[in-house]
Regions:
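Glycine-biased low-complexity/repetitive sequence motifs
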Residues: 1-31, 35
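Negatively charged
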Residues: 22-271
Length: 271
């Protein structure tokens, strides 16, 4: 067992993972600082902030960026494999923060209570299988947040009460089988939300009362068994139906007996 002392706390190396000795509390970091683990031998190049290597084996780096806008801060860091800990109190923008980090597998829970924009935050993070329950109470835009996360299997029930744009959120998340019943009462745009989610088996009855755009929402979700018909019936008969809904259910459920039966009852202009 190797021991690494950082900021007065003892850390031990358990295989390839850095853990805290004697306390579940992560090591304290300066404001606007994130601790990252990269593939052995990789020397990351950062376009923003100040970086320092904490350890060479495992390959740990601290990045400090004293700014509330962290958009694209770590995008396309293909050698990044873990977010160990972060002091992100006060950060407002995290749009495309980890986009294109195709080797990222592990993310710790960090402070997102002030974040308003998570657009494309994990876009194309194809190695992610799970995600922490981030505080999304202030977020209004989560469009393309998990677009192309082909390894993602589960999603927590985020607080989406302030979200207005949820479009393309899970496009081509082919390993996703179910999703929680998010609060979508403020959402206006659901277009392409689950496009190409071939693993999806059920569709929750989302609140569509404010939605104006549902186009391509479940396009290509061929293994859906239930839920499509109920959602169509709700959306099409609400006080103000969506004005855009072309291909909302194109091929949705076409590979399953019950799904195909529901699809047959949905009008052509919705599929």
């Amino acid at each position: 067992m190797n021991t690494l002392l950082i900021g007065g706390r003892g850390l031990f190396l358990n295989g390839s993972r850095l853990s805290v000795i004697g306390s579940p509390t992560p090591p304290s970091l300066p404001p606007y600082t994130i601790r990252l683990k990269f593939t052995e031998g990789v020397t990351p190049t950062f376009s923003k902030g100040t970086s320092v290597q904490v350890s060479s084996s495992p390959n740990i780096w601290d990045l400090t960026y004293e700014n509330t806008k962290w958009g694209q801060l770590l995008s396309r860091q293909t050698g990044l494999i873990e977010v160990i800990v972060a002091n992100t109190s006060g950060v407002v923008y995290m749009n495309y923060m980890f986009s294109g980090c195709s080797s990222l597998t592990t993310i710790s829970l960090f402070d997102t209570s002030s974040v308003e924009n998570m657009l494309g935050m994990f876009d194309s993070c194809s190695s992610l299988t799970t995600i922490p329950l981030f505080d999304t109470s202030s977020v209004t835009n989560i469009s393309t947040m998990f677009n192309g996360c082909t390894g993602l299997t589960t999603v927590p029930l985020f607080n989406t009460s302030s979200v207005t744009n949820i479009s393309v959120m899970f496009r081509n998340c082919t390993s996703l089988t179910t999703v929680p019943l998010f609060n979508t009462s403020s959402v206006t745009n659901m277009s392409t939300m689950f496009y190409g989610c071939t693993g999806l088996t059920t569709i929750p009855l989302f609140n569509t009362s404010s939605v104006t755009n549902m186009s391509n929402m479940f396009y290509g979700c061929t293994n859906v068994q239930s839920g499509a018909l109920a959602l169509y019936q709700q959306a099409s008969t609400q006080a103000t139906p969506p004005t855009s809904h072309r291909r909302a259910f194109r091929d949705c459920g076409s590979n399953t007996t019950t799904g195909a039966a529901e699809l047959a009852q949905i009008p052509d202009d919705w599929k």
